């Protein structure tokens, strides 16, 4: 497990900024419980600093996981967020969409968010911005990218796509064989 290089840090922060914006400072500058970003087998982990120091005594081949897995780097060098990062993203989300109970199951089965399923949404969502999808009782269900801005979404047909799904908590069951390998 090693620290991220300057280039890797830039790529990770750009991806995170798409979902949490300037709130990324809360991840980095937490005085009460400082956290660090670590890389292990192309996966980026968000780890409390004191735990990362303890992990230095474990050999790399023996270390499976540590902290919260935010995502992984692809072979082409791009960073892809993982569903396990949802707890971090939801806490500091900039743009949010709440879906009605009748839209939860279709979303958890891997479908996009439709206009008919939207209960409420943030007022200032631009087009193609990262959004966090919540149930009406504020339980985070996943994240994606907005298909239209908030003002355009209000005038859509009920079958129109409001947000493209990128990850949802249903992946824990659908991809349980390959999720942590």
Swiss-Prot record:
Q: Keywords of this protein's UniProt record, alphabetized?
A: Cytoplasm, Nucleus, Ribosome biogenesis, RNA-binding
Q: Which domain of life is it from?
A: Eukaryota
GO molecular function term, any single one:
RNA binding
Where the record annotates domain PUA, the positions are 94-170
Q: How does it assemble?
A: Interacts with NOP8 and RRP43. Interacts with pre-ribosome complex. May bind to RNA.
- Mention one GO biological process in which this protein takes part, according to its record: maturation of LSU-rRNA from tricistronic rRNA transcript (SSU-rRNA, 5.8S rRNA, LSU-rRNA)
Where does this protein reside within or beyond the cell?
Answer: Cytoplasm; Nucleus, Nucleolus
SMART domains referenced in this protein's UniProt entry, alphabetically: PUA
- Where is it predominantly found? cytoplasm
Query: Which Pfam family name is an example for this entry?
Result: UPF0113
Q: InterPro entries from the xrefs?
A: NIP7_N, Nip7_N_euk, PUA, PUA-like_sf, PUA_sf, Ribosomal_synth_fac_NIP7, UPF0113_PUA
Q: What does this protein do?
A: Required for proper 27S pre-rRNA processing and 60S ribosome subunit assembly.
Give any extra note attached to this record.
Present with 5170 molecules/cell in log phase SD medium.
Question: What family does the Swiss-Prot or TrEMBL record give for this protein?
Answer: Belongs to the NIP7 family.
Origin species, per record, is Saccharomyces cerevisiae (strain ATCC 204508 / S288c) (Baker's yeast)
SUPFAM superfamilies the record matches = Pre-PUA domain, PUA domain-like
What name has this protein been given in UniProt? Answer: 60S ribosome subunit biogenesis protein NIP7
What cellular component terms from Gene Ontology apply here?
A: cytoplasm; nucleolus; nucleus; preribosome, large subunit precursor
